[in-house]
Amino acid sequence: MVHIIIGGAVSFIIAILFTPILIRRFSDEGLGQEIREEGPRSHLRKRGTPTMGGIAIIVAIVGGYFLAHLASVFTPSSYKPTASGLLVLGLTVGMGFLGFLDDYIKLAKARNLGLNKKGKLLGQAVLAIGFGVLCLLFLNEHGLKPASTKLSFVRDIDTFDIAIGGGIIGTLIFLLFIYILVTAWSNAVNLTDGLDGLAAGTTAIVMAAYSIMTFWQFRNSCASNASVACYQVRDPLDLSILAACGLGACLGFLWWNAAPAKIFMGDTGSLALGGLVAGLSVTSRTELLMIVIGALFVAETISVVIQVVSFRSTGKRPFRMAPIHHHFENGGWAETTVVVRFWLLTAMFAVAGVSMFYADWLGWT
């Protein structure tokens, strides 16, 4: 438990102290966000606000994670980084770097368009497939890998193996699934990052839920507690530490990103957090449960899909603007009202998800 607290606290401190340094540096260098002309008119006043604040989030997560492990040397239970934790951390940093390239191109060209779609999808594919391949390696002494090829809700669904038939074909199907998952979640968080504090606040809530669930998995791991309700997760404690680091980093950044935002996380932050969300869902065996906990991200994405499909097929737009947070904003809701209400919705989704997780455990005991 102490490792989790240290990781979250250190990440919060790093983020809250490092973010203003980035604000001053980026302001001095004129690295400000360009605002799309077709966006809400009220957002034009945000033009020039420093961006790429996701750098602080990534540094905070990495720093908190490794310092938590370093501090564990001085506690009764020394704990080393694990394959699962390092793989999710690597995916987070890799997605963040991809987002950084996107942000940098936007700033270099002074327009709100960065990497083209093909370039971004290719980068996501390389990172997702690399993550997926490595997740099938690193077998521990209990015969567990960082990921399972079986689809999971709260735990593996034994009758639903994604790698149908096994072998090379089965592995390729599994890697395709991982690619879809990573791409979907990273883009979903990216779409949510459209209002001051929205993505940071909602992701913080999701990270809190995952820190709780993975700690419960650790306390009831089959490696130490071979009960009928135990969890077949390779490194649950390390995942809990990493989720706590994500929580702390988001809260520390939110201090400066809350309305009126002094800095934006940019694609650097949103893609990194999307990678963290996807990685945690895979390594904790909760891919389907993440849809419940991260339902707001799902709603944001679906609103864009509906808007595009409807306009292309009928010429009509069902929403005033997509993603859906802009629909409410253009409908007269104040930006802060939309953000706070979406935080509340995310909290309710998180409670529902954690309740389902715990209800499953009760059903087995």
Curated annotation (Swiss-Prot):
GO cellular component: a single term: plasma membrane
Lipid metabolism is among the record's keywords: no
Protein's pathway: Cell wall biogenesis; peptidoglycan biosynthesis
PROSITE patterns in the record: MRAY_1 (PS01347), MRAY_2 (PS01348)
Database matches in CDD domains: GT_MraY
Subcellular localization, as worded in the UniProt entry: Cell membrane
Topology in membrane: Multi-pass membrane protein
Catalyzed reaction equations: UDP-N-acetyl-alpha-D-muramoyl-L-alanyl-gamma-D-glutamyl-meso-2,6-diaminopimeloyl-D-alanyl-D-alanine + di-trans,octa-cis-undecaprenyl phosphate = di-trans,octa-cis-undecaprenyl diphospho-N-acetyl-alpha-D-muramoyl-L-alanyl-D-glutamyl-meso-2,6-diaminopimeloyl-D-alanyl-D-alanine + UMP
GO molecular function annotations of the record: metal ion binding; phospho-N-acetylmuramoyl-pentapeptide-transferase activity; UDP-N-acetylmuramoyl-L-alanyl-D-glutamyl-meso-2,6-diaminopimelyl-D-alanyl-D-alanine:undecaprenyl-phosphate transferase activity
Pfam families given in the database record: Glycos_transf_4, MraY_sig1
Family under the similarity heading: Belongs to the glycosyltransferase 4 family. MraY subfamily.
PANTHER family: PHOSPHO-N-ACETYLMURAMOYL-PENTAPEPTIDE-TRANSFERASE, PHOSPHO-N-ACETYLMURAMOYL-PENTAPEPTIDE-TRANSFERASE HOMOLOG
Record function comment: Catalyzes the initial step of the lipid cycle reactions in the biosynthesis of the cell wall peptidoglycan: transfers peptidoglycan precursor phospho-MurNAc-pentapeptide from UDP-MurNAc-pentapeptide onto the lipid carrier undecaprenyl phosphate, yielding undecaprenyl-pyrophosphoryl-MurNAc-pentapeptide, known as lipid I.
Protein name: Phospho-N-acetylmuramoyl-pentapeptide-transferase
